[in-house]
Amino acid sequence: MTEFSIGRSEIAGVVLAGGRSQRMGRDKAGAMLGAESLLRHVLTRLSQQVLPVAVNADAAAEDVPVIPDRFRGKAGPLAGIHAAMVYAAGLPGITHVVTVSVDCPFFPADLVARLAAALERQSQIAIAASEGRSHPVFGLWPVTLAADLEAWMVTDEKRRVRDFLLRHDVTEVTFPLHPTRASLLDPFFNINTPDDLAEAERWLEALRA
C-alpha cells in the first residue's frame, strides 16, 4: 500500500473574512492589532506557510484575490469554505485548500504542515483542535468535495460546518498551547469583541518579549 502524501505546492490558502462582526461593532478584518490590521496579520502568517492565498470577503482586501460567497443569507463559515474550495479547484496543480479565520491572528506557524502530514488519503479532511476543542474553520479540505458541499448546502437548512464534517472522513490534529512571557496562549484565541481585541494586544506584546 502506497503512503499518501501531499506537498505544499498542492495547497492553496484562503482567509475567511466574510462574517458580520456584530459583537465587534465594526469590520473585524480591518481592526488594528498593533500596527497592522487583523487581515494583514493573518495573511502574513498564512502566506509564510502556503501560496497562493486569497480572502473570502465581499469587498476588496489588501493585495490578494477576493472571492465572495456563492451562497447568501445565513450560510455562515460553510459558505466561505465552499467558496474557497471552488476557487482552489480552478488553480492548476492544487488538490487541497486550507482555510483560516481572520479573527485568529495567532494560529500555529506549522498549521498547514501538520494538517497535511495527518492526511492518510486524498479524500480525507484534516481539522485543527486545541484544549479539547475542535476548530473546524481551520481545516485542510480536498477541492473535490466542492460539488458535494454545494449539493448539501442547497438541501440542508442547518449549514453548519460540524454537520458537514459528520458526512466525511475527518482527522483531527491537536495543537499545543504556545508559551509566552505572560502565560500559555491558545493559538486559536479568537477576537469577537473590543475586549478580545484589547486582550490580543496584550498577547501580541507577550509574544514579542
From Swiss-Prot:
Mg(2+) binds at D103. It is found in: Cytoplasm. Its EC number is 2.7.7.77. GO terms for cellular component: cytoplasm. Signal peptide: none annotated. Belongs to the MobA family. NCBIfam families: molyb_mobA. Transfers a GMP moiety from GTP to Mo-molybdopterin (Mo-MPT) cofactor (Moco or molybdenum cofactor) to form Mo-molybdopterin guanine dinucleotide (Mo-MGD) cofactor. The N-terminal domain determines nucleotide recognition and specific binding, while the C-terminal domain determines the specific binding to the target protein. Monomer. This is Molybdenum cofactor guanylyltransferase. The gene is mobA.
